[in-house]
Amino acid sequence: MTRFLFLFLFVITSAFSQQKIETKKVSSTLSKNGITIQDDYSWLENTSDKEVADWVTLQNNISEEKLAELVKNYNFSFKIKDYDYLSTNGLPSKKGKYFYNFYRIEKNKPSVLYYRENLNDLAKPLVDPFDVYKDANVVLSGYFPSKNSRYLAFKISPNGSDRQEIKFKDFANKKYLDDVLTDIKFSNVAWNDDKGVFYKKNSNKEFFAKDSTYQLYYHKIGDIQSKDQLVFDTSNTKSNFSFFTKQNKLFVVETSEDETTKNYYYSTIENESFQFKNFIKDDKSNLELLNIINDKFYFSDEKYSWGNISYFDINNRTENTILIPQVYSHLLVGATFLENYIICKYDNMGKYYMSIHDYTGKFIRKFEAPHNMDFQIRFYDEKTNELFVTFYSYTISSLNYKLNITTGANDIYFNDFIQPKPTLFPFNYFETKTITYKSRDNKDIPIVIIHKKGIELNGNNPTLLRVYGGFGSVSSPNYDTGLLHFLEKGGVYAFAKVRGGGEKGKNWHKEGKGLKKINSINDFVDAAEFLIREKYTNPNKLAINGGSHGGLVVGAAMTQRPDLFKVVISEMGRLDMASLDKYTSGIHHFDEYGNPNNKEEFESMLSYSPYHTIKEDVNYPTCLIITSENDDRVPPFHSYKFAAKLQNRKKQKNPIYLKVNKVAGHSGNISSYEKRVKQQSEFYSFIWE
């Protein structure tokens, strides 16, 4: 490949200016299913090439300079830090014998895991990722106490990668063990008593290689990894799987490569021989497993779209018994199984509540969340029959409550070490509502809208419209102090719950996946038109944002209707659908997007693929395209190619910025507090401009 000169241009718009790089084209084509596609920027996929690295550096120099200027102008970082200091922490979670939570001790280092034996005790540090890894660019991504809390297994993510390591700590002497497990990807940790752990290993040899196969291994505490026992192998089937241990059994749920069929297995683990019984064979009904208790398999049935709880005996499946029926139009978000109770969490158009039942299905009590807040159950005290719950919302960090199941009493909880703080703003300072708008095919699409109460909605409000809309994911309020300042300054926030997500049940997901993926994008475009029509904003004040699958949606919406948006921010977006099966985990997402080896599905994917729907004669909105160099879930060259193609057109006058996070992965720069604040400040400053 010949070296090239970067050509810099200076572009001026009403708000943004940019030094622009003209990226060379190298003629290249991709052929599938009798369809040939021109792909002149495929050379940017070679991330190890110095030429690509130099190109990324120049792109970053330009975007960093502009973002630094905007951050200085709008000073979001000061308010973010101020609001963070005044925010209340949630209750610790109880796992086994101890209570756990995270604290940031040093602003330039990762969070530290703390523990306490009793809720009224002073928390003590347990795992500091920096001490373990001697690197500030590392995150503690999960922790798993053994059955009797003798050991703690924890996952470390270096440099943001999905490829992680598992390490261990001894609770008795508080020392780290020598055991280290590597090549861990998309794995939990399941204990066999205090003896050892099960984990999933990925056999990829190259960083961005197409995911090959996964194997389940058993590691005995004290052994080196090379001695670990292979328990379950998908090398021949190329399937994926999840696993967990329950009451001396190891359960494995295997999903076929095309994601249409599941097999369920279990094995006893006492003698470590691991002989599996296939107790559900070739299931295509898409059961949603909730729990397995005393050999009863609790699940939500696909034919009840809003969610129910049924069960059967894994040793003798003669029929399914419905325990808790579906509540139509109230989404069953999840279920917590206690010794004597099943606690169902429901979402009724942004109003959350818990419904408590016994194991006969009998209704016991209902608790409604205050102020339309979401909640997490942190632990249950069997002695007092009390639930300890943290409530939270987009604008309130946390309210900690104890709820008595017997009496229905509920009170704010605090002690010497867990003190409530006044909310930053009165509960009625911001108005949060979930309403619906009509899609172009006359569907009712939920949308969350937040703004200061009493603000004049005159069609001229700076507005941020966000989306995810994929994989049946159910969105939840995310407390964000950058968003708080944006709202306090007069901004409007909206989140569109488009088809493809799971906010209106299982059918809602089906209506936005595969050949119907275009519905997700159309619903999002219709949300923008709704906000403009109802005088929340106008195209010169509307910014859109989405990450991962949401990055695809906003990229596709921009190429479909560039006239609707002033600013577009795509984060870690899957923007080149033709390459879905070429790299990392894409081969496991055919059910969501389509199979590129099927002509009809491939044509559907190309019809909305942001990279392939860029037109030569359109001046697209100002863009900030964000990715991370170590994102091995959605590789960064999706964003590289999209940015290069947008920039390299004569008609493009609005600036296109590419920001590549260094030593970071799919979640961005989250390894330290200062990096997180910088990331938030840049984001909100960019859309405010």
Predicted regions and their residues:
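Positively charged n-region of N-terminal signal peptides that target proteins for export
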Residues: 1-4
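Beta-propeller folds
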Residues: 7-372, 376-386, 394-398, 403, ...
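Short, solvent-exposed loop/turn and secondary-structure capping segments
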Residues: 56, 104, 111-112, 163-165, ...
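Secondary-structure transition/capping motifs at alpha-helix termini
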Residues: 119-121, 159-161, 171-174, 192, ...
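Cap/lid segment of the alpha/beta-hydrolase catalytic domain
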Residues: 130-143, 156-161, 175, 206, ...
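Generic beta-strand/beta-sheet core signal
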Residues: 169, 200, 219, 254-255, ...
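Active-site lining segments that contact anionic ligands and/or coordinate catalytic metals
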Residues: 248-249, 261, 287, 294-295, ...
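Active-site-proximal cap/loop segments of hydrolase catalytic domains
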Residues: 498-689
